[in-house]
From Swiss-Prot:
NCBIfam families, per the entry: PRK00596.1 (NF001861), rpsJ_bact (TIGR01049)
Record protein name field: Small ribosomal subunit protein uS10
Role according to the record: Involved in the binding of tRNA to the ribosomes.
Subunit structure: Part of the 30S ribosomal subunit.
């Protein structure tokens, strides 16, 4: 797998679980002999929802809910076959979405 690059994109609602997952990936890749660039924090996506509190009237009384999606990007340059096998067997915390591009 010479001159290849693996790009891993992580998404999660909680930044602490996202950082632990990124830490595990970086540690595994460096242990197997690959060069790692990252984790690079990407912009946080923020969704805001405004809902009327009352069922039928009182439109002035509203409640706002917010959902933040944190993202990280990790590039693994020149991965070995050992690196790919170790990443496939890696156990990441639940709640982290992983997208891998070769």
């Amino acid at each position: 797998m010479a001159n290849k690059k693996i790009r891993i994109r992580l998404k999660a609602y909680e930044h602490r679980t996202l950082d632990t997952a990124a830490e595990k990936i970086v540690e595994t890749a460096t242990r197997t002999g690959a060069t790692v660039a990252g984790p690079v924090p990407l912009p946080t996506e923020r969704s805001l929802y405004t809902i009327i509190r009352a069922t039928h009237k009182y439109k002035d009384s509203r409640e706002q809910f917010e959902m933040r999606t944190h993202k990280r990007l990790i590039d693994i340059v020149n991965p070995t076959q050992k690196t790919v096998d170790a990443l496939m067997k890696l156990d990441l915390p639940s709640g982290v979405n992983v997208e891998i591009k070769l």
